[in-house]
From Swiss-Prot:
The active site is at C86, H181, E183. It comes from Escherichia fergusonii (strain ATCC 35469 / DSM 13698 / CCUG 18766 / IAM 14443 / JCM 21226 / LMG 7866 / NBRC 102419 / NCTC 12128 / CDC 0568-73). Residues 208-400 form the GMPS ATP-PPase domain. Disulfide bonds: none annotated. Keywords: ATP-binding, Glutamine amidotransferase, GMP biosynthesis, Ligase, Nucleotide-binding, Purine biosynthesis. This is GMP synthase [glutamine-hydrolyzing]. Coiled coil: none annotated. Residues 9-207 form the Glutamine amidotransferase type-1 domain. The keyword Nucleotide-binding applies. The keyword Nucleotide-binding applies.
Length: 525
């Protein structure tokens, strides 16, 4: 019998902050399971979840507006600790009898708060001391409104000159509110505050660890599928690879992985996937060479969104055909991760805008009538990687830069042709190889090469040539929502350019993309 790793759990109510998923990841890093729900949950849903504690996230709205979100009243009647962050503190204060006002100026950035009263939340935690020995905390503020009166049964724990109630607490009810963001690294002791709340105040044990998550996932897969056969589309990406390894550990030969080689992968990627999963780990893999089929479907198409949809459609067709060849397969496995689940739930409210369609949305035709196995659906990407390491997958593969689902289909601008893909594969391999040699690969968040369908004059030896152009792209980002172009050294860029032009016959010019996000997106298409 495996240990119940969901025994202690934190419920995070999302009021729309850009940092809310980060709060959840921090709680998970503390070894405690948590879930992220929209703020408008019912009392019955909270009771069913049975949380050990509740966190109210930040958010962009103003609590002074009549129709702004509020925490369900049951949150404050459930008898569990509650931690309000920024907007979460403001709605807590307002709902429990305090007062919030719009501030004349938005407070954004570093601040130093002075601890003026003892509280379980910050006891013994400090960055510095005042002249008279009071603790100071370096925090990150990001708010427009502020609490101007706390509820009568709360105390002021910390304040700044411009924010009289930076931390408030009701120790008896174990309600806490902070006007700053403890989840961001700029709040230096933020992780300790979250740990104090989750581990000490809520008394949650650290049961959420990679080894225990694997044991739990394996047990749940076995319980769900029994002796039935399962099929999985293996791409070589992190999510499908870790899904494959978990299923292999759980059901062994009853898993069949279908690897569709669409001709849009990186240099030697198909061989690497087959070697590692087939030869090294002994998984049962069906290799489907489908380059010609994908490229013929893409012929003549220039629109990026149309290309994505074509690649997705052809993949489903090929996968469908292979699945029908297998006898008695009852289950389809997918590498859905927790942010996908959150995103789908958000989209159901109609509030999310589609910037680019996800390649994996849609799934298989209804007539296949398979059950769905999603062993990663509770996990964030960083947790998936840690589990992959625990399962024996190589670090370099798990921590590779992101690669789009449609592959080179959206890194070749305009129409996709085999010639363009072959040139791009080789140029990109040189860029990545040089980044690794210069110890720059892990210093940038994502790096890749883009093929531009324009020719440029070049000189080789005594002759002129009229060949293609590629662009190098490297960015630095924390969350991929915004990004800066990476300031790579000039001599490094020169070395990469020289190698590509000299070694890849057909490319005459290399440029470097210096666009940030926004206004540009990270990928060109």
């Amino acid at each position: 019998m495996t240990e119940n790793i969901h025994k202690h759990r934190i419920l995070i109510l999302d009021f729309g902050s850009q940092y809310t998923q980060l709060v959840a990841r921090r709680v998970r890093e503390l070894g405690v399971y948590c879930e992220l729900w929209a703020w408008d949950v019912t009392e019955a849903q909270i009771r069913d979840f049975n949380p050990s504690g509740i966190i109210l996230s930040g958010g962009p709205e103003s609590t002074t507006e009549e129709n702004s979100p509020r925490a369900p009243q049951y949150v404050f009647e459930a008898g569990v600790p509650v931690f309000g962050i920024c907007y979460g503190m403001q709605t807590m204060a307002m709902q429990l009898g305090g007062h919030v006002e719009a501030s004349n100026e938005r407070e954004f950035g570093y601040a130093q708060v002075e601890v003026v009263n003892d509280s379980a939340l910050v006891r013994g935690i400090e960055d510095a001391l005042t002249a008279d020995g009071k603790p100071l905390l370096d925090v990150w503020m990001s708010h427009g409104d502020k609490v101007t009166a706390i509820p009568s049964d709360f105390i002021t724990v910390a304040s700044t000159e411009s924010c009289p109630f930076a931390i408030m607490a009701n120790e008896e009810k174990r309600f806490y509110g902070v006007q700053f963001h403890p989840e961001v690294t700029h709040t230096r002791q933020g992780m300790r505050m979250l740990e104090r709340f989750v581990r000490d105040i809520c008394q949650c044990e650290a049961l959420w660890t990679p080894a225990k998550i694997i044991d739990d996932a394996v047990a749940r897969i076995r319980e769900q599928v029994g002796d039935d056969k399962v099929i999985l589309g293996l791409s070589g990406g992190v999510d499908s690879s870790v899904t494959a390894m978990l299923l292999h550990r759980a059901i062994g030969k009853n898993l069949t992985c279908v690897f569709v080689d669409n001709g849009l992968l990186r240099l030697n990627e198909a061989e690497q996937v087959l070697d590692m999963f087939g030869d090294h780990f002994g998984l049962n893999i069906v290799h489907v060479p489908a380059e010609d089929r994908f490229l013929s479907a893409l012929a003549g198409e220039n629109d990026p969104e149309a290309k994505r949809k074509i690649i997705g459609r052809v993949f489903v067709e090929v996968f469908d055909e292979e699945a029908l060849k297998l006898e008695d397969v009852k289950w389809l496995a997918q590498g859905t991760i927790y942010p996908d689940v959150i995103e789908s739930a958000a989209s159901a409210t109609g509030k999310a805008h589609v910037i680019k369609s996800h390649h994996n949305v849609g799934g298989l035709p209804k007539e296949m009538k398979m059950g769905l196995v999603e062993p990663l659906k509770e996990l964030f990407k960083d947790e998936v990687r840690k589990i992959g390491l625990e399962l024996g997958l190589p670090y370099d593969m798990l921590y590779r830069h992101p690669f789009p689902g449609p592959g080179l289909g959206v890194r070749v601008l305009g129409e996709v042709k085999k010639e363009y893909c072959d040139l791009l594969r080789r140029a990109d391999a040189i860029f990545i190889e040089e980044l690794r040699k210069a110890d720059l690969y892990d210093k940038v968040s994502q790096a890749f090469t883009v093929f531009l369908p324009v020719r440029s004059v070049g000189v080789m030896g005594d002759g002129r040539k009229y060949d293609w152009v590629v662009s190098l792209r490297a960015v630095e980002t924390i969350d991929f929502m915004t990004a800066h172009w990476a300031h790579l050294p000039y001599d490094f860029l020169g070395r990469v350019s020289n190698r590509i032009i000299n070694e890849v016959n057909g490319i005459s010019r290399v440029v470097y993309d210096i666009s940030g996000k926004p206004p540009a997106t990270i990928e060109w298409e």
